Amino acid sequence: DVLGSRGLGDVYKRQALGAINKDFKALQYFSSPNQLLATEKSSMAPYGEEGLSRQAYRPGFDVECCSGNVHRMFPNYISRMWMNGDEHEIVAALYGPSEYRTEINGTKVCITEDTSYPFSGKITFRFALDGAPVRIPFTMRIPSWVENAKLTVNAEQPKEYHAGGFSTIERRFKDGDVVELDIDMKPRAEKRTDAGINVYMGPLLYSVDIDENVEIIKDQFKTSVAFPAYNVTPASKWNFGLPENPEITVVNTGKKLSLIHISEPTRP
């Protein structure tokens, strides 16, 4: 947020949407693409015997920095979804269902963001003002992977956008105005180190769903019944490969998404 770097938004989004334990009670110190094992002895960067478990999901490691900070992840993410610029500029930097409130020249402004992003590329911003129209530079971050998108105000003529940058609509916004950003999220394959290929859909990184053996550990150092560690090994074939330029087909199951509230006993 200090740098205002457009590229950092893509990195931040990818990290936030990566693999985490849903109750935040276990984490990896190190993670790597195509990791075959996640056990107490699987780390390839051991840092001595105590560091061998750093690629496993555990509540704690030989150092405390990650365990003490992992719970900050989504509060930090949410606090940076909306940012401010100069001259009353409002910036939608990271997308997700949310609401932003401010006051400009005595007029209270509320912007409601409706979206299923990152599972849908349709993002709708609804403006509610309790007074006269006010001039607002309204800026949206357009991810670098975007090839096609449509940006409109009140369903009128599409506006220009800048992929991999920031697009600003500056106008006198009034109560009831609607800004829509519709991103065409296509699957794409990106080459990685050592002839690897990553498959993405928008900001989401896909992985093959393989069967797994899970050993729950409750009696080791820094583990308990409430905060166990896990040894995870594959229980089905994992050694799949992709051609250099794969053809990818998307199948929409029609499943509707809903917010999931973590119950009080397991809330981190």
Feature-to-residue mapping (PLM):
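C-terminal beta-strand-rich structural cap/linker in extracellular carbohydrate-active enzymes
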Residues: I136-T139, I169-D184, R188-E190
